[in-house]
Amino acid sequence: MTGKTLYDKLWDAHVVRTEPDGTALLYIDRHLVHEVTSPQAFEGLRLAGRKPWRTDTVLAVPDHNVPTTHRDQGISDPVSRIQVETLDANVHEFGITFFPMNDVRQGIVHVIGPEQGATLPGMTVVCGDSHTSTHGAFGALAFGIGTSEVEHVLATQCLLQKKMKNMLVSVDGRVGPGVTAKDIVLAIIGEIGTAGGTGYAIEFGGEAIRDLSMEGRMTVCNMAIEAGARAGMVAVDETTIEYVKGRTYAPTGEQWESAVAAWRELNSDADARFDRVVRLDATAIAPQVSWGTSPEMVVPVTGRVPDPAEATDPVKASGMKRALEYMGLAANTPIEQIAIDKVFIGSCTNSRIEDLRAAAAVVRGRKVAGNVKLAMVVPGSGLVKQQAEQEGLDQVFLEAGFEWREPGCSMCLAMNADRLEPGERCASTSNRNFEGRQGQGGRTHLVSPAMAAAAAVTGHFTDVRQLAQS
């Protein structure tokens, strides 16, 4: 009998029943909720006279619409305020655990879940948010769902799903200095494209992935969706177990021992078969910078803006031309000659303590360049912010000329007060560089925290490896 992949094991453990058409009813272990995709779901429960099936599995937090400055003054934008107030009212009515805006535990939903130990190995985890794939870093099956599905999970604790195919992305060897998890995942997306993972659950493996901390693995799994896959995951190992141990929602005592024994089985069998295998050489990966309006439009910082004339596919060439026009770039421009206007260090991709430490290491003793209008650091949660302040990282950023903000999704998306103006160019540690993502007419370049910090202090994209040597 052929061995099972990690995805197969997680899927099989949660199937309640399988329909004749192959669709399966999956049991959901953890449901994370935020203010944007939940209002209609709660209203649906209310209209049907239903209660949530298991309130103990649900954790709610406002993150998309919350301000990152002057929280004592409340939320000024009326739409944002209504969404946050509606979540507040709904969780109180239905008895759901909630971290409100001014709670130190508040933060981005994909940061606080793992931080609290609400995300555990072997779980099925859903949220009305496409970057739920983040939680797959724990050897969990995690994926985003729509608002109608949010209501369905609240009401039944189950979800109808079609099984995906299996893909293995193995990053073999070890990365060099200055190359991070963000660079690894951008290189993967550059290799397979934004549709490369469509229809698959991606397992990330290889020595370079095993070498990553849990923060790094979360960064990689976070952007599985940018590769087209609804779910990304990493096998459980000692790194996973050590991260989870002692967290608020983690099991304790005998339950911990039995849980760990089960978690150690959460890896793909040696004879498991994948529908597709992609291999990358970790030693060949350099710090990455996106140049266009799709995460697959990415090159090493040492490279140049690609020329559409060299593309063999006319459709791709047309897309490249449009991207260059929107981004205000010329083909063959060296990446290191591109000047920036703003820097954003944050988002569910790169706002954890490891990310802030990496950025601070570059910033320490330097100043934000004169041409940079705004450089901001937005911790992923109140607890990350608290820890960073205990380590003095806030002072490193403030002394350099950065703004030190309150936790939230912030400038990852133009859904709050933090956004780009038309034509402004931003070095961003977020996950999407679509047209208008950070503000109408805004130009987004995706980079790692260290690369964002390097751009902030030089005023243009800079190979952080060279900066480290100086």
Swiss-Prot record:
Organism of derivation: Thioalkalivibrio sulfidiphilus (strain HL-EbGR7)
Catalyses which reaction(s): (2R,3S)-3-isopropylmalate = (2S)-2-isopropylmalate
Domain of life: Bacteria
Involved pathway(s): Amino-acid biosynthesis; L-leucine biosynthesis; L-leucine from 3-methyl-2-oxobutanoate: step 2/4
EC numbers, comma separated: 4.2.1.33
Subunit structure: Heterodimer of LeuC and LeuD.
GO biological process: L-leucine biosynthetic process
Pfam families listed in its UniProt record: Aconitase
HAMAP family, per database record: LeuC_type1
Cofactor: [4Fe-4S] cluster
Entry annotated with the keyword Protease: no
Protein name: 3-isopropylmalate dehydratase large subunit
Family designation: Belongs to the aconitase/IPM isomerase family. LeuC type 1 subfamily.
Co-factor note (free text): Binds 1 [4Fe-4S] cluster per subunit.
GO molecular function: 3-isopropylmalate dehydratase activity; 4 iron, 4 sulfur cluster binding; metal ion binding
Alphabetized PANTHER family for the sequence: 3-ISOPROPYLMALATE DEHYDRATASE, HOMOACONITASE, MITOCHONDRIAL-RELATED
Binding residues for [4Fe-4S] cluster: 348, 409, 412
Lineage: Bacteria, Pseudomonadati, Pseudomonadota, Gammaproteobacteria, Chromatiales
Keywords associated with the record: 4Fe-4S, Amino-acid biosynthesis, Branched-chain amino acid biosynthesis, Iron, Iron-sulfur, Leucine biosynthesis, Lyase, Metal-binding
Function text: Catalyzes the isomerization between 2-isopropylmalate and 3-isopropylmalate, via the formation of 2-isopropylmaleate.
